């Protein structure tokens, strides 16, 4: 994320994932290793056991020291789940208005949409795409727009919303509306998770829309170079693995094949190993020094 999907204070981003691809672990890493003053976490619609496991194991004492956790498990009423979501945003806004840089994690925006769907259908709203009533599509942009930089440039809410791609379906209507409202997305790949490549971030499907404003032109060029090499290798992986690719046919693919072990090492990170922005960029510049 630091190197290929650089985030800025006040950015709103979606973490799009199916089940079992390392979403909760990545959220725990973001919470424990962030430089934010306060972390506000809303666990909406999760299983009660997962809430306890996230707090005790994934966050741990280190993560809890500067965190506020609001939990509304799946067994509570949809009204309470919506109230917990509003409280998560209100607490984040309170700290932002004090001039603090806040990291807000909302897990998950999809469960918030489900809660609003239950309420909307119960009061007689007509179902539209995948059974979601119109109030869902009005609620989500309003929530997302509550993040960002505070008045007069003091304080910020950097918001990360997890979005469940049901059945790994990236064309889900909640995914679509979130993409339209957010400043980028981090897509987690089941294929990478099956290969024990963690964090299982799919570079081809992920983007940070403010990254160009945060980096120097040279650093932005280096990041795009790695993205092109990764994409080129993935598109031709089958040919390479069966030995059908002839070296020298495509110079960029030749470079990708030569650098791929280093690229894979760069893109992986142990869940207990923090790495700051400067160390990430030193490693990336060294990897692509001659590119």
Predicted regions and their residues:
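P-loop NTPase catalytic core
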Residues: 3-6, 10-291
